[in-house]
């Protein structure tokens, strides 16, 4: 494997080949660390976080035995972005009105008035 940390960075997902120790990332090719919505664009309930983590585990398992590459990490990150979009469109996830920049990066909120 490599001596440097591989990473995938999307708008709402960051994945690292590292583990957290004392709030620092330590390179570890045997672990993947998921940083979910680092900008706090959404309001997260534990059930929804659980769904994203479950999907993350499924995706990681699907790549078992394959090379851990930048491409595969980006593919996992992109698939997780799709999961977040689905949760938002289903109304299970909501935008955070108190986030730093409210830009509706996944589309305008879906309300009964707009449907």
Curated annotation (Swiss-Prot):
Query: Is Zinc among the key words of this record?
Result: no
Function, as annotated:
NDH-1 shuttles electrons from an unknown electron donor, via FMN and iron-sulfur (Fe-S) centers, to quinones in the respiratory and/or the photosynthetic chain. The immediate electron acceptor for the enzyme in this species is believed to be plastoquinone. Couples the redox reaction to proton translocation, and thus conserves the redox energy in a proton gradient. Cyanobacterial NDH-1 also plays a role in inorganic carbon-concentration.
Q: What does the subunit section of this Swiss-Prot or TrEMBL entry state?
A: NDH-1 can be composed of about 15 different subunits; different subcomplexes with different compositions have been identified which probably have different functions.
Give the PANTHER family listed for this entry: NAD(P)H-QUINONE OXIDOREDUCTASE SUBUNIT M, CHLOROPLASTIC
Q: Matching HAMAP family, A to Z?
A: NDH1_NDH1M
Q: Which family does it belong to?
A: Belongs to the complex I NdhM subunit family.
Question: InterPro entries of this UniProt entry?
Answer: NdhM
* Metal-binding among keywords: no
Q: Name the enzyme group at the top EC level.
A: translocase
| Originating species | Prochlorococcus marinus (strain MIT 9211)
Q: Which reaction does it catalyse?
A: a plastoquinone + NADH + (n+1) H(+)(in) = a plastoquinol + NAD(+) + n H(+)(out); a plastoquinone + NADPH + (n+1) H(+)(in) = a plastoquinol + NADP(+) + n H(+)(out)
The alphabetical list of record keywords is:
Membrane, NAD, NADP, Plastoquinone, Quinone, Thylakoid, Translocase, Transport
Q: What is its EC number?
A: 7.1.1.-
Q: Where in the cell is it found?
A: Cellular thylakoid membrane
Q: Which GO terms describe its cellular component?
A: plasma membrane-derived thylakoid membrane
Fetch the Pfam families from UniProt. NdhM (PF10664)
Q: How does it sit in the membrane?
A: Peripheral membrane protein
> Which is an annotated GO molecular function term of this record?
quinone binding
Q: What is the designated name of this protein?
A: NAD(P)H-quinone oxidoreductase subunit M
């Amino acid at each position: 494997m490599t001596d440097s940390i591989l990473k995938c960075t999307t708008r709402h997902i960051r994945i690292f080949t590292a583990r957290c120790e004392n709030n620092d990332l330590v390179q570890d090719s045997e672990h993947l660390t998921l940083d979910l919505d680092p900008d706090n664009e959404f309001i997260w309930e534990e059930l929804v976080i659980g769904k994203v983590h479950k999907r993350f585990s499924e995706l990681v398992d699907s790549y078992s035995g394959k090379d851990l590459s930048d491409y595969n990490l980006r593919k996992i990150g992109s698939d997780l972005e799709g999961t977040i979009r689905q949760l938002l469109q289903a109304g299970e996830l909501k935008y955070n009105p108190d986030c730093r920049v409210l830009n509706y990066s996944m589309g305008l909120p879906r309300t009964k008035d707009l449907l």
